[in-house]
Amino acid sequence: MKRTVILLGIFLAVWFAAPPVRAQNRPLQTPDADIVPTGILRVQGGFDFLQNMDYPLSGLSGDLTSYGVLNMRMGVGRRVEVQLQGTVQNFLQVNGQVPAPVTPVLTGANSTHDVGDFSLWTKLLLRREHRAPAVAFRFGFLMPNTNQARGLGNNATNVYASLILQKHIGRLKAFGDSGIGILQSPNAKFSQNDELLYGGALVYPLTSRVSVMGEVSGRYSSRKLTPALYGTESRGEGRMGLVVSGGGFEWDVAAIAGVYPNDPSTGFTFGVSRDLRLFGRQRP
């Protein structure tokens, strides 16, 4: 216990002492072409609330609250960045249930919870922005951390790859990605669903400390949704929010609206970001 307290104290000391280095990625989900500076760990955490989520694989529907929505990005070279994403805990207030391939074991009378799936990513900057847009390539995989018996996950490993374009038009930053996602079909043997990944986002700084932003991002399946494909259905979100710099942190909030029938009707997210220098010297 004493060792845990000491380690926590060291982490907090580094967190509050480290100078900010233009930390901004939340609350958007569309990846940009920027690479975090070498030796910098960008730590982002948040809270999500989504209304009327549907889970065809388990037949559950309800309001989802996500605690500890983590995104950690680290620059390991001038053109290379690694990233870890995931959620510490998801809680679903169950408002409805229909027959489905997986019969969930609820953890409460009308609720269920479990750790979220985590993903690992690598991003490579292929071309810096000049007159032509910046170009980056991003690939990664999703790990099956969530137990499908809880009704919130697929217990499947998915692979993703996408190409990112980014261009500044005056003060406006525009970027987007397009690629492919190879998703395991959890309800069918030896089957997968190849889907289109997409995203488009705009960021505009109102002042040196306040920026507004919006996006539409998700994945699209051209196949008809059958029980064999439950868990690989199309998913997408639109987000509109702002980021405020203060006290060495980046504070963000955004409204959320779903794109497809199984997506949340409405929701919001709130979070904070901070850059920590782990190694290397800060440029004067």
Residue ranges and their predicted role:
Residues 22-284:
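Transmembrane beta-barrel domains of Gram-negative outer membranes and organellar outer membranes
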Residues 9-11, 21:
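Cleavable N-terminal signal peptides
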Residues 2-9:
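Sec-dependent signal peptide recognition
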Residues 1-2, 275:
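Serine/threonine-rich low-complexity intrinsically disordered regions
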